[in-house]
């Protein structure tokens, strides 16, 4: 809901192999482009530097949401729903909906291997 700044996220996590582990779903809110000062290698400051993929929030916490902490088999599907209030773009234009994306990934917490990741743009 763009007008209320409320973001509703529905995820479906499908496994295509039999695996054993401690799997977590992690969702980050990122700003695609932020123009802000940056100190350069030569010591000068570029006041209009374009920063890309700026981490802005962890939607479901640092370690995410537990998907499964035992064995999964080919065909297992896990569903999760989240809601998140987006920062107000009238006070910081970098939070305009067309500049926001979600990076979602599945991580095995014991060894921190990432099984799959996807970037979803929120605008357009």
Protein language model annotation of sequence segments:
Residues 1-124:
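Short, conserved sequence motifs used for protein processing/export or organelle targeting and
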């Amino acid at each position: 809901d763009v007008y209320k700044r409320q973001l509703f996220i529905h995820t479906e996590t499908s496994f295509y192999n039999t695996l054993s582990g401690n799997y977590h779903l992690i969702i980050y809110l990122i700003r695609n482009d932020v123009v802000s000062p940056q100190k350069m290698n030569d010591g000068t400051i570029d006041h209009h530097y374009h920063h890309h993929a700026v981490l802005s929030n962890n939607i479901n916490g640092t370690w995410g949401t537990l998907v499964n902490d035992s064995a999964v088999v080919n065909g297992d599907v896990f569903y999760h729903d989240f809601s998140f209030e987006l920062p107000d773009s009238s006070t910081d234009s970098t939070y305009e909906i067309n500049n926001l994306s979600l990076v979602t990934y599945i991580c095995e917490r014991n060894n921190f291997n990432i099984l799959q990741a996807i970037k979803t743009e929120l605008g357009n």
